[in-house]
Amino acid sequence: MWFLILFLALSLGGIDAAPPVQSRIVGGFKCEKNSQPWHVAVYRYTQYLCGGVLLDPNWVLTAAHCYDDNYKVWLGKNNLFKDEPSAQHRFVSKAIPHPGFNMSLMRKHIRFLEYDYSNDLMLLRLSKPADITDTVKPITLPTEEPKLGSTCLASGWGSITPTKFQFTDDLYCVNLKLLPNEDCAKAHIEKVTDAMLCAGEMDGGKDTCKGDSGGPLICDGVLQGITSWGHTPCGEPDMPGVYTKLNKFTSWIKDTMAKNP
């Protein structure tokens, strides 16, 4: 599981270690500069942890399995290791994972039949509002179901190979097809529910993985999913990835934001 490998990497690595084996886009391409202004880099201390999505000046949405402590975020980044004057740094004042996510699964490093990774969402409240600019912009939540067969864009930082973990400093994008959930249910022993989306290429070669977790899945121009879990090595044939289906959670997201002004 992607996030189990992420947890092990963080457990074994030091705070100031190089970025762990976690995030990657397989079979993708370098995103056009500033084309994903809502994409957020979530850090634990100085170590890249996960992706995220800016929903409004005060709130970032990411995956619950990215839960940790001492967060900070970078907004408007294209390259994680270059000084970019347009980028913004913020600390996180509060992390609110979805109450339905089973946190105990983060500590289990083996796969079991019918494990349920539902509700893999977490809201991060920024200590200071983001400044909305050409390079830092929020993205709205979906109002309708995504259509099967849609072309979806996922993005993230990290290795661009499925097994050698050759990291890229730049934000990478990949086009994925929205597939029937039955395809993911056949591929994985874990539970696939109607609160999840299935996306990838059945022929293999294109995928998201590990610390790409928490990043956006944008289908036909609309934010529809958050990268959650899948098979390792990533990009294998008949092994599409699984994403949290956001239109099932818009009420929880909006209510949580309203209750924590």
From Swiss-Prot:
* Cofactor needs: Zn(2+)
Manner of cofactor binding, per the entry note: Binds 2 Zn(2+) ions per 7S complex. The Zn(2+) ions are bound at the alpha-gamma interfaces.
According to the UniProt entry, its GO molecular function terms are: growth factor activity; metal ion binding; serine-type endopeptidase activity
Catalysis: reaction(s): Preferential cleavage of Arg-|-Xaa bonds in small molecule substrates. Highly selective action to release kallidin (lysyl-bradykinin) from kininogen involves hydrolysis of Met-|-Xaa or Leu-|-Xaa
Checking PROSITE patterns in the record gives: TRYPSIN_DOM, TRYPSIN_HIS, TRYPSIN_SER
Highest taxon, organism lineage: Eukaryota
Q: Spell out the residue ranges making up region: Segment B2.
A: 165-261
Stated EC number for the protein is 3.4.21.35
Q: Where is this region: Segment A?
A: 112-261
Which catalytic residues are annotated? H65, D120, S213
Mind listing the GO biological process terms from this record?
proteolysis
Glycosylated residues, per the record, are N102
What is the uppermost EC class here?
A: hydrolase
Q: In this UniProt entry, which cysteines form S-S bonds?
A: C31-C173, C50-C66, C152-C219, C184-C198, C209-C234
**Chain positions covered by the region annotation Segment B1:** 25-107
The UniProt keywords, alphabetically, are: Disulfide bond, Glycoprotein, Growth factor, Hydrolase, Metal-binding, Protease, Serine protease, Signal, Zinc, Zymogen
Offer one Pfam family short name for this entry. Answer: Trypsin
Q: Where is this region: Segment C?
A: 112-164
Q: Which residues cross the membrane?
A: none
Name all Peptidase S1 domain ranges. Answer: 25-258
To which protein family does this belong?
Belongs to the peptidase S1 family. Kallikrein subfamily.
Q: What does this protein do?
A: 7S NGF alpha chain stabilizes the 7S complex. The beta dimer promotes neurite growth. The gamma chain is an arginine-specific protease; it may also have plasminogen activator activity, as well as mitogenic activity for chick embryo fibroblasts.
- The entry's protein name is Kallikrein 1-related peptidase b3
Q: Which organism is it from?
A: Mus musculus (Mouse)
What does the record give as the organism's lineage?
Answer: Eukaryota, Metazoa, Chordata, Craniata, Vertebrata
